């Protein structure tokens, strides 16, 4: 079974990750690279830049052809799999992510492989391919005649080709991972923890330079972030606020029983309780927003999984049989 093209969408990629049994991770689309935007979505495991591919000039930067054996770099073997492979590059190289049994076994199996064989190992992994193909665009070839299929293939040849590059810190080094290159590219030593802000400060100008270059050439692009599951984070934060609230209430109760307690102590605890209540309200709203977003993603993903092509094909065929199709086309395209 081949790898089929999928739409670039954070909801799709999040569900693909979940189907690969990876826990506690989701994908978000970034609309700004300013530090406040990056800081708000931490921890960020990796950034993925999507752009319309064009032949580039010769690479002058040093490509690491023999990376650390624990570093997972795979050559891009199948074009339609490049989005999933870019996500895998982040997942496989992030020690703080629970990648599940399927990816763990693949990582161990391909550990000593060169990049080309790692790419083939991904290509031949049925579980990953099945998760990817769940969101494949409907294939009209199953209902088309030979002439129609040939025409469709000719149209497909003119389709835009999109490419993905991953950026992430590994063992104190910031890397750029491009499956079309021979190996990873080191962008320099990166201080701080992988889940901190330091590597994001370092990668920001690198990605911004790429985006500016694409913008000048009118090349379409988008930026994705592989991040910790937001709802799980907020639920943990809410529980911490609730525990803090209980402690403050207990302290207030103890003060009420102490007739020698100072007024300033009451006031300090009241302020703290007020801050905690505001925190609880804020985090609760964030949880609701994440639940709503997840619900919308699931709704959209169900719509994407449905194949509307047979219905549309038969509908147009009925119109043609009744001699109504050509008049409609002529009316809207005189």
From Swiss-Prot:
Domain ULD: 307-334
Subunit structure: Heterodimer. Interacts with EER5. Interacts with UCH2, DSS1(V), DSS1(I), RPN3A, RPN3B, RPN12A, RPN12B, SAC3B, CML20 and NUP1.
Compartment(s): Nucleus; Cytoplasm
Classification via CDD domains: Peptidase_C12_UCH37_BAP1 (cd09617)
GO cellular component, one term: cytoplasm
Free-text function comment from the UniProt entry: Ubiquitin-protein hydrolase involved in the release of ubiquitin attached via both peptide and isopeptide linkages. Able to cleave 'Lys-48'-linked polyubiquitin chains. Involved in the direct or indirect regulation of AUX/IAA proteins stability. Acts as a linker between the TREX-2 complex and 26S proteasome.
Residues covered by the UCH catalytic domain: 2-228
Tissue: Expressed in leaves, stems, sepals, stamens, petals, roots, hypocotyls and cotyledons.
Site (Transition state stabilizer): 76
Site (Important for enzyme activity) residue list: 178
Keyword Nucleus: yes
Protein name stated in the entry: Ubiquitin carboxyl-terminal hydrolase
More info: UCH1 and UCH2 are not integral polypeptides of the 26S proteasome, unlike their S.pombe and animal orthologs. However, they interact with the 26S proteasome lid complex as well as to the TREX-2 complex.
Organism this protein belongs to: Arabidopsis thaliana (Mouse-ear cress)
Keyword terms, alphabetized: Cytoplasm, Hydrolase, Nucleus, Protease, Thiol protease, Ubl conjugation pathway
GO-annotated biological processes: protein deubiquitination; shoot system morphogenesis; ubiquitin-dependent protein catabolic process
Xref: PANTHER family: UBIQUITIN CARBOXYL-TERMINAL HYDROLASE, UBIQUITIN CARBOXYL-TERMINAL HYDROLASE ISOZYME L5
InterPro entries: Papain-like_cys_pep_sf, Peptidase_C12_UCH, Peptidase_C12_UCH_sf, Ubiquitinyl_hydrolase_UCH37, UCH_C
Zinc among keywords: no
Enzyme Commission no: 3.4.19.12
């Amino acid at each position: 079974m081949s790898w089929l093209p999928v739409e670039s969408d954070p909801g799709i990629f999040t569900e693909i990750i979940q189907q690969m049994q990876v826990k506690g991770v989701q994908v978000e689309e970034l609309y700004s690279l300013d530090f406040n935007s990056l800081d708000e979505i931490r921890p960020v495991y990796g950034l993925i830049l999507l752009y319309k591919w064009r032949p580039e000039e010769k690479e002058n930067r040093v490509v690491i052809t023999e990376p650390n054996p624990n570093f997972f770099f795979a050559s891009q073997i199948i074009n339609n799999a490049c989005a999933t492979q870019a996500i895998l590059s982040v997942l496989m190289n992030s020690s703080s992510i629970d990648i599940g049994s399927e990816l763990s076994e693949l990582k161990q199996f391909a550990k000593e492989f060169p990049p080309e064989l790692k790419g083939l190992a991904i290509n031949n992994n049925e579980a990953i391919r099945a998760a990817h193909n769940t969101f494949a665009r409907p294939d009209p070839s199953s209902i088309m005649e030979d002439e129609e299929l040939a025409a469709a293939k000719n149209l497909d040849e003119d389709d835009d080709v999109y490419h993905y590059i991953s950026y992430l810190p590994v063992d104190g080094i910031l890397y750029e991972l491009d499956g079309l290159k021979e190996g990873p590219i080191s962008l320099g030593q990166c201080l701080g923890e992988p889940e901190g802000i330091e590597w994001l400060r370092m990668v920001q100008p690198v990605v911004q330079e790429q985006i500016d270059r694409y913008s000048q050439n009118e090349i379409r692009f988008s930026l994705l972030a592989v991040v910790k599951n937001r709802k799980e984070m907020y639920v943990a934060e809410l529980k911490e606020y609730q525990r803090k609230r209980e402690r403050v209430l207990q302290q207030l109760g103890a003060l009420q029983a102490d007739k020698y307690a100072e007024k300033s102590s009451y006031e300090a605890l009241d302020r703290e309780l007020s801050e905690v209540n505001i925190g609880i309200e804020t985090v609760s709203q964030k949880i609701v927003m994440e639940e709503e977003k997840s619900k919308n993603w699931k709704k959209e993903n169900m719509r994407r999984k449905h194949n509307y092509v047979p219905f549309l094909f038969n509908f147009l065929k009925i119109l043609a049989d009744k001699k109504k199709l050509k008049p409609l086309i002529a009316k809207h395209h005189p």
